[in-house]
Amino acid sequence: MSAAVAPTCKATMYVCGITPYDATHLGHAATYLAFDLIHRLWLDLGHEVHYVQNVTDVDDPLFERADRNGVDWRDLAEREVALFRDDMASLRILPPHDYVAATETIVEIVELVDKMLVSGAAYVIDDEYPDIYFRADATLQFGYESGYDRDTMLRLYEQSGGDPRRPGKNGELDALLWRAARPGEPSWSSPFGPGRPGWHVECAAIALSRIGIGLDIQGGGSDLIFPHHEFTAAHAECVRGERRFARHYVHAGMIGWDEHKMSKSRGNLVLVSTLRAQGAPPSAIRLGLLAGHYRADRFWSSQLLDDAIARLHRWRTAASMPAGPDVADVIARVRGYLADDLDTPKAIAALDGWVTDALEYGGHDAAAPKLLATAIDALLGVDL
């Protein structure tokens, strides 16, 4: 992954947001922390940044959870979005320029689906519910984003709720664009009948309407590589031409707990709000997540948090000293490591080295501790 853009250009980034039916867990936090680092790195390089993040507030898990809990799905979404944003603020994750819900973008989604119908990239299944599907072969570029073979695509498509064997589909990998209204489900009016959008077209419409085609980074967790990011790109490209949807596709690794991927379906979530309520310093949570490389699948543990708390204490002690060693070299190294695929483990190791020298030997530069604290704040988002 290269986060570089031309020095005078606006840097653009679209990151897939949450489905707001449960609280923010550390897997979410790790993903948005990775893109926060890119955001901060771009700002440090002097770029203007246009960062867009969506909220998937039209999706089956949200409706099912609201029905199970006996609450209105809109109220549930509003509550969980508020908690998510509070958690992100506590972790000092810079907010996106545009924070857009799918429900705010129905007009743009309908326009996109209509264009695909007119062009032949989409078709209607003629059965009891006239759902609209996107033809996976509508763009010759389909498959470039993931690089997966067909068998892998089919497996992941089905695992994510796809319906490869639905009667009437032209192709097994064709993706749902518009789900015709069913009794008891939310729906919106459209020229092709009431219904609601499919998952992938929501992000395509939001990204195209807020940024346009050819954005610098499309990002999210590694579980979104296929089908979500592949189809989001394909939807956008078949409407706007064959120009690629994004210059770079960047994916954060999964966070596990108890030897398993952390997920709502598995029920092994470590919630940011719970850690905060237990007294964990948000900066330590952030440091704990930064201790591993953003692309790596890795496990969270109580020991990892304890180590991060101890590191935070050492860093703060060094930053409060009246003087310290020169910081020019270590700040340059941190910038270099972050520019090299966000190598936070090496950046942290470099900072640990300076802190050790400062605590053991002191220094003669009265400005050094404050300068380093400012750099750590700006580049890593850790408040000393």
Curated annotation (Swiss-Prot):
UniProt motif 'HIGH' region: location: 18-28
Note describing how the cofactor binds: Binds 1 zinc ion per subunit.
Binding site for L-cysteinyl-5'-AMP: C16, G17, I18, T19, T31, N54, V55, T56, W199, G221, S222, D223, I255
Position of sequence motif 'ERGGDP' region: 159-164
Cofactor: Zn(2+)
UniProt superkingdom: Bacteria
Top class in the EC scheme: ligase
Molecular-function GO term, any one: cysteine-glucosaminylinositol ligase activity
Record EC number: 6.3.1.13
Keywords for this protein: ATP-binding, Ligase, Metal-binding, Nucleotide-binding, Zinc
Catalytic activity: 1D-myo-inositol 2-amino-2-deoxy-alpha-D-glucopyranoside + L-cysteine + ATP = 1D-myo-inositol 2-(L-cysteinylamino)-2-deoxy-alpha-D-glucopyranoside + AMP + diphosphate + H(+)
Example GO biological process: mycothiol biosynthetic process
Residue span of motif 'KMSKS' region: 261-265
InterPro entries linked to this entry: Cys-tRNA/MSH_ligase, Mycothiol_ligase_MshC, Rossmann-like_a/b/a_fold, tRNA-synt_1_cat_dom
Ligand binding (Zn(2+)): C16, C203, H228
Any single Gene Ontology cellular-component annotation: cytosol
HAMAP family: MshC
Family statement: Belongs to the class-I aminoacyl-tRNA synthetase family. MshC subfamily.
Function: Catalyzes the ATP-dependent condensation of GlcN-Ins and L-cysteine to form L-Cys-GlcN-Ins.
Assembly notes: Monomer.
Protein name as it appears in the record: L-cysteine:1D-myo-inositol 2-amino-2-deoxy-alpha-D-glucopyranoside ligase
Source species taxonomy: Bacteria, Bacillati, Actinomycetota, Actinomycetes, Mycobacteriales
